[in-house]
Amino acid sequence: MGKKKFVNKNKAQTFHLVHRSQRDPQYHDENATERVLVSAETLNKTARRLNRQTLDEEYGSTIRPNEGEAANYGIYFDDTEYDYMQHLRNIGNEDATWVEAPATRKTQDKQKKQQIQLRDQPSILPQEVLPSEVELERTYQDQQSVPDAISGFQPDMDPRLREVLEQLEHSDINDEETSDFDEEFEKLVASGKADESEFYAQPFVEEGEKDYDEAAAAKAGKSEWEIEFEKFKLEQKKQPDVASSDGDFSDEPESEERDEVPELVSSSKSKSKTKRKARTALSSVSMSSSALFRNEGLTLLDDRFDKVEEEYTPIKDERELIDPDQKDVFDLVNDNQFNDIMDEFLVSYGPTLGRKKAPSRMSNSKKKSSLEELDNVRKMLGRARI
């Protein structure tokens, strides 16, 4: 009896020691190995290109024409070695008879629960010496820390995405704030239960009326003018509106002509406190061109734009076009002067003024009568009114 072979070449699995791929996620990991073991079958598959001709040469003679069609009829067994389609017949043929199989409810429920799960054969080697199952793409966009789609100045970016990016940039500040909050909370818990009278005796501070903390603002990276501006806005909110209160309770009597119907309070103002939600802290600097640095060229462009805008501004009142210091034309002309001018024009018209006319066949008496008629018409019309 011969010795048993240590390795059966027919059933053995061959591996090759190769360098780890650059697309492997563990390529830059110091703890990972530089070389990995890859099966010879996978190397052969990746080395040669699969096309229709090679597939026909390898599997064309062994594959049946109806192989794999049994799954369309509910037969999920492996039909590579046995043809299950030979037992099926089309309904309606002479040599076929329909026999309904008795199916119980339990078997139907089991069939619904059964699902096909394809699992790869587990490897006999540890995962540390094998390449990663997922490989990364080595394209330009995939190697960037921030993709071009969300990088740069984008005023139309989704505000929710902008808020997340801002929080990621200031992650250190948030960590410090949370640590300070935890310390204050621990001190508050250690102090014990508070007295109700002391709690209600504290001054009530509405949302947005906290005392301004310059240290926290400086830690957030704000400039001096931003800090001063926020302090000014906070003090402006705290001051009561004296003008509005005096106007509502004025003791001066008003006439009925000045009575006006007051405006109704809109529902949006009354519900502003109830609808208030967590929002991002908006800065006092806008993202428009007015917040950018203005050099001489941009300043000149702004002046030209303002001038063009004034030309296209609609005139609300036509009286603005009239100069109040300018005298009216009708005030400069007297009625007697106007009548003298008209008489002189009618008498001298024809031979000396205007275009040349054909010689008039009207006698002097008729001309005098026509002038007299014109004078009569004037007298009947009365004095000219302008």
UniProtKB/Swiss-Prot annotation:
Its main location: nucleus. Belongs to the LTV1 family. Involved in protein transport. Non-ribosomal factor required for efficient nuclear export of the ribosomal 40S subunit. May participate in intracellular sorting of GAP1 out of the endosome. GO terms for biological process: protein transport; ribosomal small subunit biogenesis; ribosomal small subunit export from nucleus. Residues 248-262 have a biased composition (Acidic residues). The gene is ltv1. The lineage of its organism: Eukaryota, Fungi, Dikarya, Ascomycota, Taphrinomycotina. Residues 103-126, 198-219, 236-287, 353-374 are annotated as: Disordered. Keywords: Cytoplasm, Nucleus, Phosphoprotein, Protein transport, Transport. The modification Phosphoserine is found at S171, S179, S244, S245, S286. This is Protein LTV1. Coiled coil: none annotated. One of its GO terms (cellular component) is nucleus. It comes from the Eukaryota. It holds the Pfam family LTV. Residues 270-279, 354-368 have a biased composition (Basic residues). It is found in: Nucleus; Cytoplasm.
